[in-house]
């Protein structure tokens, strides 16, 4: 299967979700699937773990730092990002799209809205009291169901 994997967080900054995405892509390869990653930032070619994904990685562009949930998320969003997401989805012709943090205002939600392939989503955080999520919850409910 051709699997599109969307990471909302920039690969220019190390993080748990980014590492999870790479681990998932590596596992999918061992199972005979073809994973393709879309994320802001770029891989570190000096890091052999990241460099092995060079041919299947597409950068969604540079990211901006956004304070969120006691941390700083480096994400991108907007018309240029939306065009990159749509192009990646169209060119990828994926059998399945796996979106990490699908309601984060980032390329993740853009991919959720634009994908015509079946979508699997992974939520890495639980923020039931987040005002942002409470406000977005009603708007996003149809997209995540």
Residue positions per predicted region:
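A short helix->loop->beta-strand "cap" motif at the edges of active sites that frequently abuts
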Residues: 116-118
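Short N-terminal targeting/anchoring amphipathic segment
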Residues: 85-106
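Membrane-proximal helix-turn-helix segments that form the acceptor-binding/catalytic region
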Residues: 127, 133-145
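Extreme N-terminal starter segment of soluble prokaryotic enzymes
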Residues: 1-3
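Conserved alpha-helical elements of sugar-nucleotide-dependent glycosyltransferases
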Residues: 16-27, 107
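N-terminal strand-loop element at the rim of the active site
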Residues: 7-14, 26-79
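Histidine-centered beta-alpha loop that forms part of the nucleotide-sugar donor binding/catalytic region
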Residues: 8, 100-101, 123-127
């Amino acid at each position: 299967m051709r699997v599109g994997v969307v990471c909302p967080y920039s690969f220019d900054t190390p993080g748990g979700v980014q590492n999870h995405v790479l681990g998932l892509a590596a596992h999918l390869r061992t199972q005979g699937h073809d994973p393709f990653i879309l994320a802001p930032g770029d891989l570190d070619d000096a890091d052999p773990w990241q460099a092995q994904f060079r041919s299947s990685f597409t950068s969604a562009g540079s990211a901006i730092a956004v304070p969120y949930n006691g941390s700083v998320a480096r994400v991108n969003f907007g018309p240029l990002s939306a065009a990159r997401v749509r192009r990646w989805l169209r060119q990828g012709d994926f059998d399945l799209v796996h979106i990490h943090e699908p309601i984060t205002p980032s390329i993740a939600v853009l991919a959720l809205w634009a994908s015509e392939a079946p979508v699997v989503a992974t939520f890495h955080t639980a923020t039931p009291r987040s005002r942002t999520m409470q406000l977005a919850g009603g708007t996003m409910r149809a997209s995540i169901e």
